[in-house]
Amino acid sequence: MPEHPRHCDFQRGNVEIGLGPGGDLLGKRLSCPCITSHCSSEKKARSKDPQATSLLPELESTMAPEDHYHQLMSALSEASSFEETQRLYHLGIPSHDLLRVRQEVATATLRGPSGLEVHLPSSTADHRRKQGLVQRREGAVPAAATSFSEREMSQPPPLLSPQNAAHITMSSHLRPPFLGMPTAVCQTPGFSFLPSAQAEMLARQQELLRKQSLARLEMSELLRQKELGSVHRPLLPAPEVALHIPEGPDELQRRGSMLVLKHSSAPLLALPPQGPPGPGPPIPPKESARSRSEKGSLGVQPSQPKETTGAGLWAQEVSEEPSKDSDGEDPETAAAREGTSTPSQVPAGGTRAEGRGLLSGSTLPPPLPLGFPCGAVSPYFHTGTMGGLFTDEETTTLEDVNKWTVDDVCNFVGGLSGCGEYARVFGEQGIDGETLPLLTEEHLLNTMGLKLGPALKIRAQVAKRLGRVFYMASFPVALPLQPPSLQAPELSPGHQPLSPATTTSPYEGTHLPTGQASPKQENGSGTIALLSGAPDPSQLLQ
């Protein structure tokens, strides 16, 4: 045993473990209460003792490698005060060298006990060199560390924290002053402080991930909207189709004719060349026209309304009509069918087309507002055999309602079923033939106090006697057919009027100016041609 057994007890209280000169940094020695101020003299005496050098072989032979490793780990893991650690870093000790030395200690511990050296405590590095310790790591010890005692030097924080440990990024004004190194860690297990460079890199990665997720969400939303649009698109009309506004009179006329055809009235199409399918054999176009002219000249008319009725029911579509009607017809008739004739050509050169019940393209009526149906299925219109635009013997004969007196109007209303009680109201209001066509549903219901059924019946009967399909379209002023001052047109030889009543009808006039309307009574059937001229306000509702 050595002379000073009190100082040779290999306990944690007075044992210093180190690796060569690095013991200044790696050695851990806690103060013992029994050590007094004469410790330095005892250390000097003990260092000069030749038996002190024999301690190393004994220690190495008596201590197992596991004991060396446990003592080393316990010395490294002992925490020190914050002030001592802060002073250690303020000395300017490089953190990289410090970590390198600690890693070498761990490597030497794993290799074997020969790498560990246990020596007695001494006050200076010169005494440790005299004890024969290994000097190969002398350059790694900073020069500034030799001026302080081992008591003032404390163990730095443990090794680097694992990669999966929680990191705390703090700003510079919240960090401890010694955490400026790129690899500095916190002493608290499980947490560590990220340096500024690593914190910025982590923030950039998080921002990039956030932007990628947002872009992915936006793309998925766009794809979903596109799929929904493709699913619901066939159910909705295109905006340009739904909000299309007709441009020009030609477009208005085309839309008007298509509207009439769509609602099953077809008043604008003539008899097809091959004739309608029926009980009788079909008649060729030229022969049928010639036979009709002969029948009109002889006054034989009973069978013709049936043919015109068939023309209204078996009218062709607009797309098929020009191609089928162009065969076997002269250019004049074809031009009249295609609507290329002008208003000046209608009275003179368009007699054949008008005789067949066709209106030229320039004389098509404008479309009804809001697509109001004016077909044969509508109960508000007197369609007759040709949709109300054409008159024949099956329809009510046109009467001069304008010449009716108040008594005539009262008799007319009293003669209708369910309207007899309202004849007195018409007499009190002074309704005569001129004002009767001007009455609207609002006048009849609100002003005169009629019920809805009688009011509609009166308007339907007035429209039937006027022969105007637009009378029941809720217009306060019906579309005028011709001014009252006009004389009956001159009839061509071989043509006769429908009945004696039509000779005294309001269709009086010699020659029509352009833009007015005139009835064409030809081949035993009356045809009303509507021209595109604006009516005179003084010539309304005849």
UniProtKB/Swiss-Prot annotation:
The modification Phosphoserine is found at S499. Its main location: nucleus. GO terms for biological process: negative regulation of transcription by RNA polymerase II; retinal rod cell development. The keyword Phosphoprotein applies. One of its GO terms (cellular component) is PRC1 complex. PROSITE patterns: SAM_DOMAIN. GO terms for molecular function: DNA-binding transcription repressor activity, RNA polymerase II-specific; identical protein binding; PH domain binding; SAM domain binding. It comes from the Eukaryota. InterPro entries: PcG_chromatin_remod_factors, SAM, SAM/pointed_sf. Self-associates. Component of a Polycomb group (PcG) multiprotein PRC1-like complex. Interacts with SAMD7 and PHC2. This is Sterile alpha motif domain-containing protein 11. It comes from Mus musculus (Mouse). The gene is Samd11.
